[in-house]
C-alpha cells in the first residue's frame, strides 16, 4: 500500500503526510483511544481507524477505537518505524515552502507585542531575584569575559583564522566598553604598549568604526529540517558573533551553577531532560512541552525586561545584538525578536526566559508571591534545555496557556 501510494502521490507522502499520521497515532496512544479529529483525510475502516496500516492498527485498538489491554508493541514499533523513517529526509525545501517560511518569519516578528498580565509581572520580579544570584550586577562580570569565535558560518563568509582579522568594529560595542583594544585579541586584558610595537600590530590596520545605521544585518537562511518546514538560521556578522560568545559563556556557566537554576537549566548535558522525558512517559508525573518558533518568539522587550534590574549587563547584551535581518528575498527588516538561532546568546537567553515564565505561571496560579524561597521551591519540577521544556504533567495545560498569553506558541498534540 505504501509503495503504491508513493508512486501516485510522490515523496511528500513519506516526508509530510505519513509523519502527520504518526503524530495522530501517538496522540491516540496517549489518550488511550482514537483521538477526536485524528487521521483527517485518511479513508476510515469499519472500526473507525484508517484503512491505511489497518493490519497493524487492529492489533493496537479495538473495534470501538479504544486501546487494547494487550496492544502489540511490535505493531506500535512498526507503525512508528514506517511513518517516521523519512520525516527528516535531507532534501531542500521547495521554493514555494521557502517563500512561505520567509513570510512566516516576518509575520512571527510582527506578532510580537508586550504583555502586561500577572504571569508577565511575576516573570519580571523573578528575573530580578535570579539576576542578583547570577552575579550580573555592576561591572564586575566584564573582568571574566572571554570572547571567542565559534565554528559556524558568518555574515561575511569568513572562516578559520581569518575571523581574527577585524576590519570593522561597532561603535555600539565601544560605547559599553567592549573595545577593540581591550577585547580584540580574545581576552579581557587590554592590548599593551609592547603589543602595539610588535610587527603584527604595526602592520595591521585598525578596524573601521561602524555606526549603528551602517551595521550589517544578520543573513537569514533556511536549512532543511523537514520538507514541510525549514529551520530558520540567522548568520551573524563575525564581530557580533565574537562578542556574543563572551556573554554567552559567562551566562551559561552561572545559570548551570546558580542556586536557583543548577541542574534545572542545562547547556552541556541534554541527557538530564532525556531521562526525565522517559520517566515522565512511564510515570505520567512529568510532561514535555513542544514549542513552535521558540527562539523567534522571544521578544526584545521580554529580554530588556528580564535584565531590567541589571542595566549594565543588559546594555552589553543589547550592544552585541543584531537589530536587522536580511531575508533570502533581499528584504531587510528591523527585528522585534531578540535573536534567531545563529546568535550565540539565543540559547542561554531563551532558556532563561522559558524557565522564569514557567515558574511565574506556577506561582501565579498557586497564589504565591515571588520571593527567593518561592522561586526555589517552584523551580524544582521545571527543567529547561533551550526550548526543550519539562514541567509537572498536571500543570502542563495551564502552563501552556500562560506561555501563550505572553506570546509563545505551544504545539498541542
Language model segments and positions:
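Core nucleotidyl-transferase/polymerase catalytic module
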Residues: 190-413
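Non-catalytic, polymerase-adjacent accessory regions of viral genome-replication enzymes
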Residues: 1-221
Amino acid at each position: 500500500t505504501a509503495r503504491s501510494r508513493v508512486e501516485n502521490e510522490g515523496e511528500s507522502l513519506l516526508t509530510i503526510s505519513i509523519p502527520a499520521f504518526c503524530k495522530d497515532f501517538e496522540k491516540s496512544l496517549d489518550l488511550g483511544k482514537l483521538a477526536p479529529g485524528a487521521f483527517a483525510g485518511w479513508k476510515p475502516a469499519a472500526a473507525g481507524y484508517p484503512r491505511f496500516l489497518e493490519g497493524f492498527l487492529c492489533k493496537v485498538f479495538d473495534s470501538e477505537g479504544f486501546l487494547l489491554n494487550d496492544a502489540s508493541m511490535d505493531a506500535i514499533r512498526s507503525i512508528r518505524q514506517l511513518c517516521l523513517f523519512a520525516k527528516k529526509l535531507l532534501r531542500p525545501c521547495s521554493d514555494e515552502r521557502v517563500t512561505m517560511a520567509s513570510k512566516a518569519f516576518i509575520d512571527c516578528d510582527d506578532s510580537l507585542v508586550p504583555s502586561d498580565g500577572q504571569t508577565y509581572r511575576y516573570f519580571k520580579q523573578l528575573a530580578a531575584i535570579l539576576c542578583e544570584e547570577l552575579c550580573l550586577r555592576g561591572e564586575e562580570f566584564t573582568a571574566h569575559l572571554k570572547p571567542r569565535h565559534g565554528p559556524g558560518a558568518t555574515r561575511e563568509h569568513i572562516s578559520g583564522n581569518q575571523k581574527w582579522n577585524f576590519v570593522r568594529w561597532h561603535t555600539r560595542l565601544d560605547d559599553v566598553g567592549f573595545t577593540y583594544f581591550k577585547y580584540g585579541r580574545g581576552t579581557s586584558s587590554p592590548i599593551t604598549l609592547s603589543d602595539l610595537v610588535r610587527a603584527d600590530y604595526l602592520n595591521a590596520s585598525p578596524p573601521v568604526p561602524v555606526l549603528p545605521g551602517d551595521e550589517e544585518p544578520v543573513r537569514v537562511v533556511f536549512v532543511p529540517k523537514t520538507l514541510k518546514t525549514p529551520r530558520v538560521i540567522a548568520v551573524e556578522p563575525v564581530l557580533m558573533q565574537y562578542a556574543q560568545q563572551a556573554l554567552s559563556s559567562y551566562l551559561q556557566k552561572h545559570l548551570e551553577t546558580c542556586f536557583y537554576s543548577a541542574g534545572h537549566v542545562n547547556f552541556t548535558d541534554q541527557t538530564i531532560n532525556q531521562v526525565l522525558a522517559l520517566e515522565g512517559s512511564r510515570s505520567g508525573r512529568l510532561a514535555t512541552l513542544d514549542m513552535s518558533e521558540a527562539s523567534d518568539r522571544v521578544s526584545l522587550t521580554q529580554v530588556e525586561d528580564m535584565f531590567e534590574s541589571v542595566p549594565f549587563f543588559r546594555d552589553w547584551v543589547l550592544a552585541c545584538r543584531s537589530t536587522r535581518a536580511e531575508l533570502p528575498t533581499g528584504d531587510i527588516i528591523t527585528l522585534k525578536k531578540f535573536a534567531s538561532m545563529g546568535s550565540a546568546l539565543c540559547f542561554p537567553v531563551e532558556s532563561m526566559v522559558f524557565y522564569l515564565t514557567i515558574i511565574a505561571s506556577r506561582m501565579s496560579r498557586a497564589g504565591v508571591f515571588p520571593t527567593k524561597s518561592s522561586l526555589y521551591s517552584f523551580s524544582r519540577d521545571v527543567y529547561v534545555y533551550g526550548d526543550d521544556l519539562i514541567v509537572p504533567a498536571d500543570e502542563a495545560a495551564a502552563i501552556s496557556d500562560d506561555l501563550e498569553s505572553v506570546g509563545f506558541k505551544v504545539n498541542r498534540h
